[in-house]
Structure formats: C-alpha cells, structure tokens
C-alpha cells in the first residue's frame, strides 16, 4: 500500500503540470483567435445608406471607442502569440516561479487592456442601439443594422477574449503562488 501512495504522489504533480500547460495553451490559442476575429470584424464593419438622396455612412474609424477596441485586440493578439511562444520555452526549461509570475503579469496587463476596450465599445454601442433621450442623442442602429450587428458581434467576441484572459490570469497566479509556497 505505501508503494501505491508513493506512485500516486509522484504522478500527481506531473498530471497537474500537464493539465496546467494544456489549459494555458488552449486558452492562449482561443484568446489569439478571438482577438483576430474581433479586430477583423470591427475593422471591416461599415455601411452606406441613402436616406432621401442623402448618403450616410458608418465606419468603425468614426468612433474612437471602436478604434480603441480594434487596436487593443490587435495588440493583445500579438502579445498573446508571444506569450504562447514564451510558454513553450518555459515548458522546455522546467518550472521556474519567476516565469509563471511573468506570465501572470502579462495576462493581467492584457486582460486590463481588453476590459478597457470592451467597456468603451459597449458604452458607445449602447448609445448607438438605444440612444439617450435626455441628451437628444438618437439611436442609429435602426438605420445602420449591418454595421451595428458587426460591431456588436466584435464586442461579444472581445468579451469571450476577456473570459479567456481572466482564466489565464487566475491559473497563472495560482501556479506562481504554488511554486513559491
């Protein structure tokens, strides 16, 4: 019986390490894909309409908040790709608490960027969809449905990215804490 306990305690950290690495790789790949998809949807969102001979167009570049979200996702996607490469190097070199702490700081910074981009884009998207009767801002999404749907999909994918980065931040923090203890 003591032999089985020793065998379990030796294999458990290896299984835990493999699970941690698998989770990290999976969520980093999903974060990269979500960043690319969200940026692409936002950058390509535009619509031109003709209302009584007046041509109006809506583009992401007309809104600083939408530009911020698009470029935030580009930056986060690039840095997430670099962190994936860094993770592969960390796995090959072995467990060093400092490496996991750097991953934690990276994930926290990327998560903070995405939170800012999502908050800004959600605010302006809400105004576009519902308007604000107190200030006289009219809703535009009833006229620019295609543009608003693409922007809304982009923001939704950014929130998915935020969830992935939150999971990465929590797992990296947990791993760096366990390594130090």
From Swiss-Prot:
Major subcellular site: membrane
Extracellular side: 40-70, 122-152
Residues in compartment: Cytoplasmic: 1-18, 92-100, 174-181
Protein topology in the membrane: Multi-pass membrane protein
Keywords from the named record: Cell membrane, Membrane, Transmembrane, Transmembrane helix
One Pfam short name: CASP_dom
Transmembrane segments: 19-39, 71-91, 101-121, 153-173
Record's subcellular location: Cell membrane
Cellular component annotations (GO), alphabetically ordered: plasma membrane
Disulfide cross-links: none
Stored InterPro entries: CASP/CASPL, CASP_dom, CASPL
Domain of life: Eukaryota
UniProt family annotation: Belongs to the Casparian strip membrane proteins (CASP) family.
PANTHER family named in the record: CASP-LIKE PROTEIN 1U1
Subunit structure: Homodimer and heterodimers.
Protein name as annotated: CASP-like protein 1F1
UniProt organism field: Populus trichocarpa (Western balsam poplar)
Lineage summary: Eukaryota, Viridiplantae, Streptophyta, Embryophyta, Tracheophyta
